[in-house]
Amino acid sequence: MDLFPVLKELAQKTPSKILLIVLDGVGGLPLEPGGPTELEAAKTPNLDRLAEESALGLLTPVYPGLAPGSGPGHLALFGYDPFRYVVGRGALSALGLGADFREGDVALRGNFATLDPEGKVVDRRAGRPPTEENQRVIAKLKEAIPRIEDVEVLFYTESEHRFLVILRGEGLEDKVTDTDPQKTGLPPLKAKALDEASERTARLVNLLSERIREVLKDEPRMNGALFRGASKKPSFPRMQEVYKLTPAAIASYPMYKGLASLVGMEVLPVEGEGDALEGKLKALKENWGRYDFFYFHVKKTDAMGEDGNFHGKVEKVELFDALLPEILALGPDVLAITGDHSTPALLKAHSWHPVPLLLKAPYLRADEARRFTEREAQRGSLGHLRGVELMPLLLAHAGKLLKYGA
């Protein structure tokens, strides 16, 4: 059900402020039966105190049984039906980087990968190289591959192993499959067209993959490329129109900036490299008076999960916990903390498991949950929600929705 027409009628502008904190991939699993999840293992005194004053529940970001990508996971949290509002990873990266991304272009998100002499993937992220190394290799590709046939090829560094390619030319469509096999020990997949109009794009992506491998054959780690999320430039309703909000985003990585800009948020500058939590906190404080909705993104919880680093993920949760008192001191009227999906270190991948949701607002019903963990969230008064149900709940608690019906 598309609630946007209803919410447009009910939404009203008020001075109350909403803060949505997304701990990327926060949900986890025990490493062994009976053990703690990452959240349960973390020492989080500030989150524990907050949980005692809040309501908790579980949230299925997209749909039961589906392991969502960050795109649909986030869009659902912002209230956009992820089955109706679909956007590829390439477009999100292009929007987040502020790339020269035009109507008719096809953008692809790339990972530099390490391939063995037989062409099989050894490391899907090339050892997470420094961004400076990425920039060096991208410069090499820009010089060597300005075009594929009559199509212009634009390369952009994103961060670490991530990069962006934009294809510009006549007759390009974006219905092509990914080349990332999603596991090691296999060669990169061939891009395949999902409709007749996209056959040219699929062929060009395969030619580009081969050419990149030729150019980078002497690189010790970054000697191959995996592509996913081929997409053209989308157009979505803006949060200002639907919710009557003045929204801002505080994120470091281009994909999340792209998601935010796609739905109408102003992306605030953040000082520092990587996840830059101190820089994000500074941006939040400096801009607190200018907006009534803030999206605050924490990335490294997800990265540690994907790397299979259980203790690293625990540490990232604890780092966030240490910042929480300064965030709470700003006095948001409504505060939500959740994730866009689960990334258990045990699985080294996104999973279908629900994530915990914490909600602090003036008019909550108390519950018995005492920690921000998966197990405690099952006891919470919020019950079990789907991702798209979160935004109406936040708006209601902030006094931003009128009564529905007579």
Swiss-Prot record:
One of its GO terms (molecular function) is phosphoglycerate mutase activity. Keywords: Glycolysis, Isomerase. Pathway: Carbohydrate degradation; glycolysis; pyruvate from D-glyceraldehyde 3-phosphate: step 3/5. Its EC number is 5.4.2.12. InterPro entries: Alkaline_phosphatase_core_sf, ApgAM_prokaryotes, Metalloenzyme, Pglycerate_mutase_ApgM, Pglycerate_mutase_ApgM_sf. CDD domains: iPGM_like. One of its GO terms (biological process) is glycolytic process. It catalyses: (2R)-2-phosphoglycerate = (2R)-3-phosphoglycerate. Coiled coil: none annotated. Signal peptide: none annotated. Belongs to the BPG-independent phosphoglycerate mutase family. A-PGAM subfamily. Catalyzes the interconversion of 2-phosphoglycerate and 3-phosphoglycerate. HAMAP family: ApgM_B. NCBIfam families: apgM, PRK04135.1. PANTHER family: COFACTOR-INDEPENDENT PHOSPHOGLYCERATE MUTASE (PTHR31209), METALLOENZYME DOMAIN-CONTAINING PROTEIN (PTHR31209:SF0). This is Probable 2,3-bisphosphoglycerate-independent phosphoglycerate mutase. It comes from Thermus thermophilus (strain ATCC 27634 / DSM 579 / HB8).
